[in-house]
């Protein structure tokens, strides 16, 4: 009896201790306009959070509740998305405009509240309406509940958040609006940035426009690398230093040693770096990876830099010596990109096997790529006598968000009529040579505008082949799924061949991600369990492509209990104007 009560007391203390360790992490994000000068241009009005570029970093521990009060003092409609947060039980906090909520209007506010159970690593947050995420973004760092000593890798001496971005010498909202009205894609960025700063290799860069990171010789540092860029995958290197990747998209990986990290928009990488070089100054460099074949319009083939500065490197003889610059990969180095993307595997912990599901309920074969469409009625400046304008699609369905009701509200009310249809196709409408350079299926270039969703039963296991197409150009598309992580079973080039590919499936320790860079002119196979009820956006993380329709939505039906069902919307959920 004494042993019995002792055991109960121990369990009770453990439960109380566990609850006590969880905290509420609360922030107020004031989204407003302020002016900033970069690259010797006149002051530019940008939209940002709390007058910062990048915005504030949110630090939490696994199991914490995050509460963010969005106060919109900008002149634009606004939403925030918590990229990679699973949002189990909190689908109303996911953030994409007209998918899970109507935008917060100027002068309005909304409180995002969600939990980070079962997630550790680097995620991030960003605006999810128009092109505002070009300047409305920041890091979301989730540490283990047990602190740094609980990392499944050597404890770092310090951590650095490294956010890669893109910069335009223009107002991005006006740029996006003009692209829509004319049907002509928005221009490429004028510069790349590291922590909001372009660095030393742009004309007229000022000394205060280069980010700096302090290290001590032989120290170990955890770099939390985020590609918050709008449209460009980036190579990331540190001169004279090698990196050991230990995580990607807030999922631990087996240690992967490399001298170059490749991050597509939306992705994150956690990498350890030992400061083992001679005392001095070294450049971190972020340079573009252009995967398009044939290459499209000219883009900024430039390099953003930050300075890694060793303690003791302030002495004149060292300070006046220019930092060492790493050799950057060729801009079209697909081999290096593919080697990195396909080289990582999951870290299996505590002797547990991988959670990858082995039985599949639903198979989908989904083409992703560019196409064309006729001018839409709302495109008032579109040249209707010229050739068709650019579009993009998945299985030839070019996604259009609803105008008056968010998808999640229509789903919750069980009133889809007039808002969306449940007929997203499981396969392409026509089978053809998807990646052939001489593809003759010109009719498939024309896409159909629609708001189609794929409806899934609760707990259904889905295997999806993502197939790149060559109709306009082959290109690596970073495909992101809200509300889920997925396992990457295999990836390769050319047209997907089921028999050959299945022999290569990794069902033992496949990497787990929320965003996958589908190989240019190739394919990838992902698998996940639809155990999160709600309406979940799946889209290319090139904003130039999502605005053209390279998206769809997964509608996951309720499970058998209140805990496995979409809860009622919060009282302050914004209304559509």
UniProtKB/Swiss-Prot annotation:
Q: Which GO terms describe its biological process?
A: lignin catabolic process
Details of cofactor binding: Binds 4 Cu cations per monomer.
Q: Which residues are glycosylated?
A: 33, 109, 169, 203, 208, 218, 332, 383, 396, 404, 441, 459
- Annotated positions binding Cu cation 4: 477, 540, 545
Alphabetized PROSITE patterns for the sequence: MULTICOPPER_OXIDASE2
UniProt signal peptide:
1-22
Ordered alphabetically, the record's keywords are: Apoplast, Copper, Glycoprotein, Lignin degradation, Metal-binding, Oxidoreductase, Repeat, Secreted, Signal
Q: Which cofactor does it need?
A: Cu cation
The subcellular location is: Secreted, Extracellular space, Apoplast
Matching entries from Pfam families are given as: Cu-oxidase (PF00394), Cu-oxidase_2 (PF07731), Cu-oxidase_3 (PF07732)
EC number(s) per UniProt? 1.10.3.2
Q: What CDD domains has UniProt attached to this entry?
A: CuRO_1_LCC_plant, CuRO_2_LCC_plant, CuRO_3_LCC_plant
Would the keyword Cell wall biogenesis/degradation turn up in this protein's UniProt record?
A: no
One MF term in GO for this entry? copper ion binding
Tree of life domain: Eukaryota
Write down what this protein is called.
Laccase-25
Its organism's taxonomic lineage begins at: Eukaryota, Viridiplantae, Streptophyta, Embryophyta, Tracheophyta
